[in-house]
Amino acid sequence: MFDDGQERGAMIWKKAPRRILAATAGGVLVATVAGCSGDDPPDATPVAEQLAQAVASGDLAGVPLGDTAAEDATAAVEAIVAGMGAATRTVTVTDLEQTDDENTRQVTLDVGWDLDGSGAPAAEPGTESPTGTAATTSTPTPTASGTPDAPDWTYQTTATLRVAEDTEAGWTVDWSPAILHPQLSDGATLDLSRTQATRADILGAGGEVIVTERPVYRVGIDKTRVDAALAPESATALAEVVGVDPAGLAERVQNAGERAFVDAITLREADAAPLLAQIEAIEGAVAIEDTLALAPTRDFARPILGTVGDATAELVEESGGRIVAGDVVGLSGLQAQYDAQLGGTSGLTVELVPPEPSGDPTATATASPAAEEPAPAEPEVLFEREAAPGTPLATTLNVELQSRAEGLLADVAPASAIVAIQPSTGAVLAAASGPGGEGYSTATLGQYAPGSTFKVVTSLALLRAGLTSDSAVECTPTATVDGREFSNYSDYPSGAIGDITLREAVANSCNTAFINQNAVADQASLAQAAASLGLGAEYQVGAPAFLGTVPAEADGTAHAASMIGQGEVLASPLAMATVAASVAAGHTVAPTMVDPAATPPEGTLTADEAAVLQDLMRAVVEEGSGAFLGDVPGDPVGAKTGTAEYGTETPPRTHAWMIATQGDLAVAVFVEDGESGSRTAGPLLEAFLGG
């Protein structure tokens, strides 16, 4: 039986309601209604929260929807958001209040969309929209917070809850697509489109443009322009013209969709020009004009700068939504390391796509076709974020010096490198790696024994132990430490054997003179001296770099080998150029390849120490193994030759090194397989300094 004030199915309560605030499980304050007696309707908050979670997930199962089946509502949501790609949404209850009808409640939902994969929570209403309009709690105006954690698109929507005695919760939801967005109606959908931003340039010293958009041709097979059975044959022919793997291209073409364009290669305009006629003669082969971020030449600083191209599946997956299939992104080098900066922010547009129009069932047979088939309504833009171009990346590379270095290494068969640093700033002006490295950045990442170029470091350790440049050291034909015999290089001048000064030992590169001092400078002092010259340090160069390792502990033959830059001592050409730069600058130099400059290290090298080292390096040119540099035009040159044995062959193979300073320039030259520093690296250094 029911009391007089109630009706079956309607569950009407007559008590005057009051609006209160209660905290939900998610911490959101929700307005609820409490009556004055046990006859009041149950709390609607759980249903409101259940609805919010369901709208967020797209699964309406379990939500009391009145006359609408949960599976129908779920299917409707799925259809509405099918065009939103991987975008995700959060939905929270912000208000729940009684309407004019005391048996209904209106729930207000905050909806926040993460359109670009940032995974951010919803923003507060009232923040600035992309158009500068403040969003309010009563309109669905899109908003964008100025913080990185804000969603891309936010708005509010409402839903109506009704008292229902036949449900466990006591309430049902009036289902409508408008719960997902206020402007949605039956059959309407949401569609997200994305515009990739303009990629920024990579700049060199003085702001000179190095990498910018340059004309290219995308060459491939258009399967709509060739019979499917002949497509693999065309692919093979095209591969032979452009120099790619014929079998691989043919297989990709065979497996691609019937309307696919299958890329074979992207060619610079100048490289493609002589091939265009041959490409055109192949059925289905096309060359499409395009642009791509490229350096001045194909090989210009390629191991450093890297390349750009179509995003791989792995990059898309790892980007968290920032990158999508079809984007052109950095694939290696600085292009990949600074891709977010260079790539900018993609533009996003969400449109409401109206339902397809249907013919008027009351139309007569004489009605015009236009009347029978109304023109489709235009999509309406609900949210738009313009693409923001990338920010240029400023590097320290000097185009002229980099080009000169690469030109000198072009015909060097083994792995090789030339690195130039400006001592006054630490700026890396050139970091060229020869073709023998097969694309590896020998200049910055190579790990090799530095040989006698390390004697600059050993000299600093000896100076700190009390020696001077005029101190006598014993240059013997051989030196034996713990049973291991060390000797000088084969054509060491016989006149420089015996008691000589430290200056003469450096000038002529006497191995035994330094090994005979192994008790004067221990391994720890070598490591400290190396750090004072920037070798073995951990500076933020701005690009991947190996700045060397010098063990702090070693004794016996290992320590003796360290005295002449062998054993476990390793350096890259960049590291040895840093040593030379520190000598020239008069203080420890931190090399920098990308602005802003690296934090200068604490001053561990004194000006007085550097002055002595400068004199020792000048002695190499004035009276020693670098005499051939004496006539290089310009400021006086200081240098140090280096030859480092490696491998197990007899006689052992050797790395060829040379470092030099001239004015505000420090240079390191390296050839992985060479005769000696002066004979192999020396001519390259002389040509580089001579311009």
What are these regions (language model features)?
Residues 12-38:
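Secretory targeting and sorting signals
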Residues 39-46, 60-106, 115-119:
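Short solvent-exposed beta->alpha transition segments
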Residues 120-126, 130-132, 142-192:
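Short beta-strand edge/turn micro-motifs at domain boundaries
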Residues 179-196, 211-221, 228, 253-256, ...:
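Short pre-catalytic segments that frame enzyme active sites
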Residues 172-176, 180-182, 190-202, 211-244, ...:
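Small/polar-residue-rich segments within soluble enzyme cores
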Residues 37, 58-59, 91-105, 260-282, ...:
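Conserved SxxK-family serine transpeptidase/carboxypeptidase catalytic domain
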Residues 371-373, 380-381, 414-447, 461-673:
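Beta-lactam-recognizing serine transpeptidase/beta-lactamase-like catalytic domain environment
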Residues 30-60, 121, 588:
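C-terminal region of N-terminal signal peptides and the immediate post-cleavage residues
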